[in-house]
Amino acid sequence: MKPFTVHKGKVAGIDRANIDTDQIIPKQFLKRIERTGFGKFLFYDWRYIDGEKPNPDFELNRPENEGATILVANENFGCGSSREHAPWALQDYGFQAIIAPSFADIFYNNCLKNGLLPIRLAKQDVEYLLRESTKADYELTISLEDQRVYDDSGFERTFDIDPYRKQLLLKGWDEIDLTFVYEPYIAEYEKKHCPMS
């Protein structure tokens, strides 16, 4: 994973609640275990008509949202079945952060474990961001170090994140990387407490 410290990027909004993981990445695309190649299937049933032609009415297909790296959505984002493919698809598409009033717990944790930053903001703040996201080239800056989200027009909010998860994201580590960092201590512990016969 790459470290997440400060990110400034274009915002795309999907003003829908209860977007489930099957809408994020439909089940027929879950047959692979690589983390890449899922972006083209993100929101597949909404993005394409008959699986081929881009749907001009879907938010991410609008020209002003091309290149967006921050997604804003409504309540209960990522509900439904647990699948790591959902954050993989969002990342592979180009998103680095998701902002919503609430997330399904399992999806929220899957995002953090895979280096995608989920940010909870108050409903009225998300509504403001959804309105602003309809403007061409609307951008937000996210500072994980300061736990702040802000734009160039004076909007600024702080957000909460578990300190442990924050440190992993800042360093670009997953839990396997953390195990490697502590490997000498683990080996020493095993040597003291589990001697070989």
UniProtKB/Swiss-Prot annotation:
SUPFAM superfamilies: LeuD/IlvD-like
Reaction it catalyzes: (2R,3S)-3-isopropylmalate = (2S)-2-isopropylmalate
Keyword Amino-acid biosynthesis among record annotations: yes
Enzyme class: lyase
Record carries keyword GTP-binding: no
Pathway terms, separated by semicolons: Amino-acid biosynthesis; L-leucine biosynthesis; L-leucine from 3-methyl-2-oxobutanoate: step 2/4
Any one cellular-component term (Gene Ontology): 3-isopropylmalate dehydratase complex
Enzyme Commission number: 4.2.1.33
InterPro entries per record: 3-IsopropMal_deHydase_ssu, Aconitase/3IPM_dehydase_swvl, AconitaseA/IPMdHydase_ssu_swvl, IPMI_Swivel, LeuD
One Pfam assignment: Aconitase_C
Single biological process term from Gene Ontology: L-leucine biosynthetic process
A single MF term (Gene Ontology): 3-isopropylmalate dehydratase activity
Keywords (A to Z) from UniProt: Amino-acid biosynthesis, Branched-chain amino acid biosynthesis, Leucine biosynthesis, Lyase
Subunit text: Heterodimer of LeuC and LeuD.
Protein family (similarity comment): Belongs to the LeuD family. LeuD type 1 subfamily.
Annotated function: Catalyzes the isomerization between 2-isopropylmalate and 3-isopropylmalate, via the formation of 2-isopropylmaleate.
PANTHER family in UniProt: 3-ISOPROPYLMALATE DEHYDRATASE SMALL SUBUNIT, 3-ISOPROPYLMALATE DEHYDRATASE SMALL SUBUNIT 2-RELATED-RELATED
NCBIfam families found in the cross-reference section: leuD (TIGR00171), PRK01641.1 (NF002458)
Protein name, entry field: 3-isopropylmalate dehydratase small subunit
Origin species: Geobacillus sp. (strain WCH70)
